[in-house]
Amino acid sequence: MPKYVMLSSLGPDGFARLRENPERLREVSTEVEAMGVTVLDQFAVLGQWDFLNIIEAPDDVTMAKVATTLASRGTLKTMTLPIIAIDDFIAGMRG
């Protein structure tokens, strides 16, 4: 199944919600998984982006649904990148 990196950056409203309820991060993961994907790992990061998630989804369309649903809430912006395992990448370069 394809994997993706989703980077997210919270806006002021997103930070306010997070300060009120830090467990909201886990709640959002549960909501995201209800859309048909699996959150494999989640990290807080420093810099331009606030969070990095590794997500497995059946296809690009499902992942686009997740990204647009989250962005439509107005509390964050996202960037989603498809990722390829290095072994698969090397095999593709050879083949």
Segments predicted by a language model, with ranges:
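Short S/T/G/P-rich N-terminal loop/turn motif that feeds into the first structured element of a domain
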Residues: 1-34, 38, 45-49, 84-95
